[in-house]
């Protein structure tokens, strides 16, 4: 005779520290600024959370300016924040955990780009890294409608989201000391457009004639987070 056995009750899976989403990182920048770095993917849903957090934090009494970056937010203060940052950290964590997002109804710009040649001196390096042809890279680069995630690096420079990972190329080991304004470049999984002359460690594949920053205009930067860019082909030089 077989003795019946008592069914075992399934146990709930145990959540360990490694199963949890990493916490945002909060650090001081000098004596009057703080940087909030969000974990997770660098994509539009994530960036919309950054925009929402910036809008909220901008209204906090101690915050002078809230500046969204790529997966991060910088808060500046008119005077050094109190030594005990626990309340501010808690407010940031709580606001982030609420998961609010913000959609920005920006404008759409078409940027004619001269690819390759003197305008895109590193296009050959992108070809060598990806194994794609020049025509393939240009076609892939011009296909998306890119969203301006943030402004930074230098006045008017726009960080764009939405580049196809097939043309991702590591940043250059030796930066270029002088890169003309309007240069269209690839750095890792990102692409962007230089607003003015200056150094860069990205791979320049082309150039546009559009002016992105004019200190005499109001606002001086042409683009803003939430705007969209579509690159078009002016010509391809090889």
Residue positions per predicted region:
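Glycine-rich active-site loops that engage anionic ligands at enzyme catalytic sites
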Residues: 2-4, 15-238
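Low-complexity, simple-sequence tandem-repeat tracts enriched in small residues
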Residues: 7-13
């Amino acid at each position: 005779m077989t003795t019946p056995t008592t069914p075992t009750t399934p146990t709930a899976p145990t959540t360990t520290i490694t199963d949890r989403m990493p916490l945002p990182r909060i650090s001081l920048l000098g004596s009057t600024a703080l940087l909030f770095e969000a974990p997770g993917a660098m994509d539009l849903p994530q960036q919309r959370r950054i925009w929402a957090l910036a809008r909220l934090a901008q209204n906090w009494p101690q915050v002078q300016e809230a500046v969204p970056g790529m997966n991060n937010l910088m808060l500046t203060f008119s005077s050094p924040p109190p030594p005990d940052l626990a309340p501010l950290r808690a407010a940031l964590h709580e606001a982030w955990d609420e998961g609010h997002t913000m959609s920005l109804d920006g404008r759409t710009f078409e940027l004619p780009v001269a690819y390759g040649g003197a305008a895109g001196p590193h296009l050959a390096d992108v070809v060598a890294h990806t194994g794609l042809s020049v025509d393939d890279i240009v076609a892939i680069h011009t296909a998306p409608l890119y969203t301006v995630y943030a402004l930074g690096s230098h006045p008017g420079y726009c960080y764009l989201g939405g580049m196809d990972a097939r043309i991702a190329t590591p940043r250059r080991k030796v930066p270029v000391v002088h890169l003309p304004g309007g240069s269209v470049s690839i750095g890792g999984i990102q692409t962007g457009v230089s607003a003015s002359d200056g150094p860069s460690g990205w791979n320049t594949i082309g150039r546009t004639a559009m002016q992105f920053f004019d200190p005499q205009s109001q606002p001086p930067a042409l683009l803003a987070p939430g705007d969209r860019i579509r690159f078009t082909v002016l010509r391809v030089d090889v």
